[in-house]
């Protein structure tokens, strides 16, 4: 009886560990091609063609990579250069 309990506990543990990953994979697969049809000519499928990723924030004038404002002195001469920390690029002001 001890061996049966051990194998049952091992199986249950493995099942619990793998279940969330299997469910997530199944859910992801179902989202790829779902269509709702009212008639043969009218079907709404989603998701539609994937949109390319876009950057929400864009720098005004991108320059060379920088980590401090001093890195932008040569690039922005004679203007003052500021390092945009978000994009790590120089911005001339």
UniProtKB/Swiss-Prot annotation:
<dbReference type="GO" id="GO:0005576">
    <property type="term" value="C:extracellular region"/>
</dbReference>
<keyword id="KW-0295">Fungicide</keyword>
<keyword id="KW-1015">Disulfide bond</keyword>
<protein>
    <recommendedName>
        <fullName>Putative defensin-like protein 283</fullName>
    </recommendedName>
</protein>
<feature type="disulfide bond">
    <location>
        <begin position="66"/>
        <end position="90"/>
    </location>
</feature>
<comment type="similarity">
    <text>Belongs to the DEFL family.</text>
</comment>
<keyword id="KW-0929">Antimicrobial</keyword>
<keyword id="KW-0732">Signal</keyword>
<dbReference type="GO" id="GO:0031640">
    <property type="term" value="P:killing of cells of another organism"/>
</dbReference>
<keyword id="KW-0611">Plant defense</keyword>
<feature type="disulfide bond">
    <location>
        <begin position="72"/>
        <end position="92"/>
    </location>
</feature>
<feature type="signal peptide">
    <location>
        <begin position="1"/>
        <end position="24"/>
    </location>
</feature>
<feature type="disulfide bond">
    <location>
        <begin position="43"/>
        <end position="83"/>
    </location>
</feature>
<dbReference type="GO" id="GO:0050832">
    <property type="term" value="P:defense response to fungus"/>
</dbReference>
<keyword id="KW-0964">Secreted</keyword>
């Amino acid at each position: 009886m001890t061996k049966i309990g051990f194998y049952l506990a091992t199986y249950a543990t493995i099942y619990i560990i793998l279940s969330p990953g299997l469910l997530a994979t199944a859910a992801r697969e179902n989202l790829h091609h779902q269509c709702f049809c009212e008639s043969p000519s009218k079907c709404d499928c989603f998701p539609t063609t994937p949109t390319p990723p876009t950057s929400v924030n864009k720098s005004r004038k991108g320059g060379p990579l920088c980590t401090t404002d001093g890195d932008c002195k040569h690039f922005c001469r004679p203007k003052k250069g500021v390092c945009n920390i978000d994009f790590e690029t120089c911005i001339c002001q």
